[in-house]
């Protein structure tokens, strides 16, 4: 049982991958939020994905119980700390317990199974997604941008993304002449529109609302680099093995920075604590808390990331 949120669900894929490696003849059932069901579709050892569509009076848990109680489960992994894992027949179960430890979420998830090596997130791709990705993202250098987020407070201004794209793709830059692929969900077009409008039409690749999660991962796999807000898309890019730079403001990078050797992050001059403890902070507001992050440090962080890795040709 994993998250409703794309980012947390992506980060949990390492646990599933570990269990499937440890038990090579086993299959898995995954219960998750509707928005992340497609993430598990390409994994041929996941035989069922149950969408936990929230219902009144915890009806979604009752429905999941009726779908689960008739099976004896060898292992139950409950990352939502629900009562359900106690109410279905099982041999062993493992429950995630949230703590305030200053460690990455992947490390915390690994502790659920007592793992000394954190289970790196991964994505599963199938050939159909790879074929479609080749149609959507052309050969040659492509810079991927993720200008959206599930909350306005975490969004770096679209105008800053536009300036970043120009800086990184100008003559003599690290990605000189690259196309720019803009990713986001269908309902996020308004957030990305100023960026798309500012890019030359022969340079931009508009992928807003055109992909599910596996296809987005396949498209990202064809990009040289991803730069984006702290979001599920950022974690998807990192899990797909794409060099990934995450942008942080009102979220704690020690817990949610992109995971992997070819990743990095840059944050606002203000720390997470300074932002959320400010007198004018309101978590209900959609106002960006990322405006103090200038383009220059993001360019510098991108160049630093590129210098640490060898970008594919």
Task: Indicate where each model-derived feature is located.
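Catalytic machinery of carbohydrate-active enzymes
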Residues: 1-313
